[in-house]
Amino acid sequence: MEMTSGSLGNGIPEAMGQNRGNIKRCLEKYIENGRRVMKLNELMDEMEIVINDVTQRRRVMEGDLGKILCFTQAVVIPPNVAFAVRGTPGNWQYVKVNSSNLSVEALSSTQYLKLKEFLFDENWANDENALEVDFGALDFTLPWLSLSSSIGNGLSFVSSKLGGRLNDNPQSLVDYLLSLEHQGEKLMMNETLNTARKLEMSLILADVFLSELPKDTPFQAFELRFKECGFEKGWGESAGRVKETMRILSEILQAPDPQNIDRFFARVPRIFNVVIFSVHGYFGQTDVLGLPDTGGQVVYILDQVKALEDELLQRINSQGLNFKPQILVVTRLIPDAKKTKCNQELEPIFGTKYSNILRIPFVTENGILRRWVSRFDIYPYLERFTKDATTKILDILEGKPDLIIGNYTDGNLVASLMANKLGITQATIAHALEKTKYEDSDIKWKEFDPKYHFSSQFTADLISMNSADFIIASTYQEIAGSKERAGQYESHMSFTVPGLYRVVSGINVFDPRFNIAAPGADDSIYFPFTAQDRRFTKFYTSIDELLYSQSENDEHIGYLVDKKKPIIFSMARLDVVKNLTGLTEWYAKNKRLRDLVNLVIVGGFFDASKSKDREEISEIKKMHSLIEKYQLKGQFRWITAQTDRTRNGELYRSIADTRGAFVQPAHYEAFGLTVIEAMSCGLVTFATNQGGPAEIIVDGVSGFHIDPSNGEESSDKIADFFEKSGMDPDYWNMFSNEGLQRINECYTWKIYANKVINMGSTYSYWRHLNKDQKLAKQRYIHSFYNLQYRNLVKTIPILSDIPEPPPLPPKPLVKPSASKGSKRTQPRLSFRLFGA
């Protein structure tokens, strides 16, 4: 974003005159160590060294320069210091200050990025023909949100803009409705009503006819009469429902308004079959949680599918249709499945009637790849995977899906490729964008690439987020961060990968494609610990052994001497970002906390040789060293990753029985599903202030925020709570109850599913309206994919397996089917190993 009149940059010269001496010393301190990139904490720390007088420091901080320093990063190239200033979420300005004469110059984002590149690749920075990526140049005709507070409310914004478009061109809606069909059957309208005028007149006549019928008259009773007038099924299951829907459409055609547009598209029969991509890790329903690259995303999707199917069934019924929705979760088939079902091609999803997991293998020139592949090494296999998956999906669904949803970088890229090929509405869900998790991973990509292949990943992320018709985020912070920290998507607005490309405009967080839809927790598993009649008593004995047995075995090490103490508990993957070793070290160093509570950690393996994940191996070794260094046995229990979700629900409640707490200490957490699970069980929760948990928890009301970068402060905050709750039992109860209330009001899967299906319906029409611009953008993306992504992927080694015995002849694919009775409680189909 350019520096504009009235911006912070224009106030700096005056501030320089008022605080010239202090500011000059401050800037001289910044350039003292030569060229470098400085983060906010470094800027503030070095300013405090130079301006040690508290009054003078406050004067500087209250001025324009202080405003800059509080929300910025800087590039130091003596004698200049260039600042990237974040005034509000999504709004960035750039300014360069000369430390010698304090002159100020406004910069463009391109100029600022070039200065940053100068530190890492001077030749690239000076290359006038260096590749610049500017997706924003293709979106100039579309409307944008304007206020930071409105970010993530894209659907409401689109509905408001549709009103103007429909007022100017109602025929576009008529054409869209005429295109609706499913399984070869026309829906809502036929060609008899091919103009807006004809439709308006017919709606008036239909209203008169319907007013004479009892509201509960089934649609079938007047279906033939309606068909003669140009109306097909899909308006509703009864005369009353049909009349309501038609009146909403009549009002839209006469005077469109956002509320009626929302109501109408919520009733349009547009979404029946959904494909969800989640490629990496071990995607399954049992025995997978805690395996490499396998965690909350799997839980999220399985719960998501149940909610979406329930919502679709309810909608299809209210539309007066008898179609059955189908949802396919498409993932990788892994022949070496580690005692999981990840080597089964087709698997019904428990708790659903019409939803299945479809697994497609990775295929190389040597055949099917049998071994697990890290999410960082997955990119060479995705193009072939997309092709094979598309063939199977079209076969199973007997046609195209109506909506494709991608998950994480790999799933989003595959979803983008397939949606573009088939012309289908596409949504993306990031879960986590790795660029924000690894500091300076863009400008220092050459250091990271041999291990993480971030050049391929960042390129794939740019492709998928710009291909999507709408983007689902769990929280505002995921998109645009907080006052103190930029959001995951916000960090992709402009950045540079020196030597590859300079992103002038990667994504705009004011884009109306962004929508917040927070997931919930499965309430059949995660319910309050006080609901004694619902609790899973069959797990009591095994959980007691898990927590309190004095023996050490392959499932738990360490022990708890004082069983009367409350337990603080954390459960996550054992990697650097999740920070379980960080929590352990906080606890180990805080004597007061150790005296008050026990610590139980659930995650990973004990034996590093059992892990194939690079980060997990490192964290395993670190955890063992902490146990020995601080002599934690007696107050500490380390339990291996637990894959039984039902027992995990009871584990949360068992911790609540001790009047303990759940602690989520991640350096960054995009959403925080375990936070939702813990609070749903009535467990008092402390969670990171970096990411989604900061929105889930109202600090000091429904739980507590902790700072993962300040272990001493965080551990003291936990200790303070337990000291108070030890003196006043109602103090613990208050936070438990407030946490439950917060979940019930804001975080349920029913709310989520309703939002997502509404998005799918409305954005399908928005896509129809903007198809020419969509095509132009796809051509730009196609070039970027072919000229950049494909070449980057070639640098990633293709894995190979030890030669296996010749495969058995393939058998025909068994298509999914479901009985008309109750929902599945266990698999009922026979399966074969894909390609074997």
UniProtKB/Swiss-Prot annotation:
The keyword Secreted applies. This is Sucrose synthase 5. One of its GO terms (molecular function) is sucrose synthase activity. One of its GO terms (cellular component) is extracellular region. It is found in: Secreted, Cell wall. Sucrose-cleaving enzyme that provides UDP-glucose and fructose for various metabolic pathways. Functions in callose synthesis at the site of phloem sieve elements. Belongs to the glycosyltransferase 1 family. Plant sucrose synthase subfamily. InterPro entries: Glyco_trans_1 (IPR001296), Sucrose_synth_GT-B1 (IPR000368), Sucrose_synthase_pln/cyn (IPR012820), SUS_EPBD (IPR056736), SUS_N (IPR056735). Its EC number is 2.4.1.13. Disulfide bonds: none annotated. Residues 270-748 are annotated as: GT-B glycosyltransferase. Its main location: secreted. GO terms for biological process: callose deposition in phloem sieve plate; sucrose metabolic process. Detected in the whole plant but more precisely confined to the vasculature in cotyledons, leaves, petals, anthers and roots. Also detected in developing siliques, young immature rosette and cauline leaves. Residues 805-836 are annotated as: Disordered. It catalyses: an NDP-alpha-D-glucose + D-fructose = a ribonucleoside 5'-diphosphate + sucrose + H(+).
